From Swiss-Prot:
Residues 268-275 are annotated as: G4 motif. SUPFAM superfamilies: P-loop containing nucleoside triphosphate hydrolases, Transducin (alpha subunit), insertion domain. This is Guanine nucleotide-binding protein G(o) subunit alpha. InterPro entries: Gprotein_alpha_su, GproteinA_insert, P-loop_NTPase. GO terms for biological process: adenylate cyclase-modulating G protein-coupled receptor signaling pathway. Belongs to the G-alpha family. G(i/o/t/z) subfamily. It comes from Geodia cydonium. Residues 34-359 form the G-alpha domain. Gene3D superfamilies: GI Alpha 1, domain 2-like, P-loop containing nucleotide triphosphate hydrolases. CDD domains: G-alpha. The keyword Cytoplasm does not apply.
Amino acid sequence: MGGCVSATPEEREAKTRSSVIDRQQRQDARQYENTIKILLLGAGESGKSTVVKQMKIIHGDGYSQTEXRSFKSVIYGNLAASMRVVLNAMEKLGIPYGNQASQEQARVILSLSNSLSSYESFPPDVTSAFISLWRDAGVQECFSRAYEYQLNDSAPYYFQNMDRLLREDYVPDEQDVLRSRVQTTGIIETSFRVKQLTYRVVDVGGQRSERRKWIQCFDDVRAVLFVCALSGYDMTLFEDGKTNRLEESLNLFQAICNNKFFVKTSMILFLNKADLFRDKITNSDRHLRLYFTQYTGPDRDVEAASRFIQSEFMERNLNKQKIIYPHLTTATDTTNIKVVFGVVLDTIIRENLEAANLL
């Protein structure tokens, strides 16, 4: 009659180790199923970082007063940089100041540091210079011709709210934070939970020099959210001063959409800065056909112009089995982004369930 042979200590240890590994693998698998990684891509100045801020406001805890205060130096840096751009443009466009005192005030602003971290507050002479210059007729004329040079998208907002921004007790609110602009460098990840799912949104800098880092983020991506600035159709890249921004976005989208890493990945397209696009198409003479000769629609027709640009993106998709989900967005508008992002999350969940044959 045979007896049982007891396991050796080494065998018991190996079995325990195997059980721990199996348990960890099951836990990792559950976590993977409950975590959706969204890769946020697009060219520089497209509004990606603003989309991330909106996610924090809509699905996170928003911005505390302490967090909002940390943006003050950035906002002041944006304000100073925007005013410098206008003042330099006045010289190039040959626009005189409305009064002689403005020339001295302009020198005060032009002498400010370019560093965004330089200003937690401005001295009285700088504050006075900002306010007086904004009221100057020449500055106003130059500002009204901003389509003729490259002015930060947030400049109108900051100029129009200048009196509030320059108060001694000023604390940035969420709208001020949304309008703030710092070039994204490196990889920034934001996480939030909606309906028992964790979303990891990975934002990578869109400037050309940052794109070599993108491939580091391609693993386990469940959706790509590509952001394009509609209003860039008449503008050139800061990097080289000659490449059309919209053309750059189209080429970049084609490379991403048809990348082997994303054959089965949900592809969401945000046609962003729709508010600026509408204003430019409707109120300026910078007609779309002047920059994209293949556009044959009417001038000042926002719907026709946006349909044309959307179709240009769709044509860059070489895999006709792949569905692109386009949305017109204004990233600074929390209500708009809340509605659109709700649709986006539902789309991502549905596509992932279909891919797993659960629908």
